[in-house]
A protein has these predicted regions:
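Peptidoglycan-targeting cell-wall enzymes and recognition modules
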Residues: 2-24, 50-152, 170
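Active-site-adjacent mobile loop/cap segments within catalytic or ligand-binding domains
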Residues: 172-194
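Alpha-helical scaffolds flanking conserved acidic
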Residues: 43-52, 170-177
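Secretory-pathway/luminal and periplasmic proteins that interact with or process carbohydrate-rich
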Residues: 56-67, 157-159, 185-190
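An N-terminal domain-cap segment
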Residues: 13-44
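Short secondary-structure subsegments characteristic of cysteine-rich extracellular domains
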Residues: 196-201
Length: 202
């Protein structure tokens, strides 16, 4: 399903990006539009919420990021270690980001951050991409787009799928946050989703 890209970018530039879009943001948005236009699904609410999720999870950058927004794995690990030692990660029982016996770190990476080896393995099985052998692939745009789209369509992240929240007359912008992370920042992400949906001609 073709999207009027000029109308889309004109709309989001004003509503979500303060009147200006960097080239990297345009590239990230375009990569998600390209994936949607392959035709696997046609419900633009799905695309709007995927865009909203990528926007939120990357702090508006629309490029794959590491947990803590660090430039390198080593810096992300150091930041997480400091936060853990200071008691700022009460939800974490074991430091999953520390390198394993093979030197791999299972910290969060991507447009929607997957963490822990088991989750990399689950997404590897669904996408056919070797995320266990090379977890750093989640930092590549094409791979990260596939992880986000496949994960949100299949329910790989939490068991909840886009179809559980957008189907026929059902439109659940707030509850859709459960696809990724409970109801954390659910109202904020819902607002992004509605803005993207309007920009898509919804």
């Amino acid at each position: 399903m073709a999207i009027d890209r000029k109308a889309f970018f004109d709309a989001v530039r004003g509503t979500l990006y303060g009147g200006r879009l960097a080239g990297t943001q345009v590239a990230g948005l375009a990569a998600l539009l390209d994936r949607f236009e392959r035709g696997e699904v046609e419900d633009r609410r799905f695309l709007a919420y995927m865009l909203a999720t990528a926007h939120h999870e990357t702090g508006g950058r629309l490029q794959p990021v590491r947990e803590t927004f660090a430039a390198t794995d080593a810096e992300a690990i150091a930041r997480l270690d400091r936060a853990f030692a200071a008691g700022r990660l009460p939800q974490v029982s074991a430091p999953y980001w520390r390198r394993d016996g093979e030197g791999k770190s299972w910290l969060g990476r991507g447009l929607v951050q997957i963490t822990h080896r088991r989750n990399y393995a689950r997404l590897a099985g669904l996408t056919g991409i070797d995320l266990v052998g090379r977890p750093e692939l989640a930092m590549e745009m094409a791979v990260s787009v596939e992880i986000l789209c496949t994960g949100m369509l299949s329910g790989a992240f939490t068991g909840r799928r886009l179809a559980d929240h957008f189907s026929g007359a059902l439109t659940d912008w707030v509850g859709a946050r459960r696809i990724i992370n409970g109801l954390d920042r659910a109202e904020k992400v819902a607002g992004y989703g509605r803005a993207f949906f309007t920009a898509l001609g919804g």
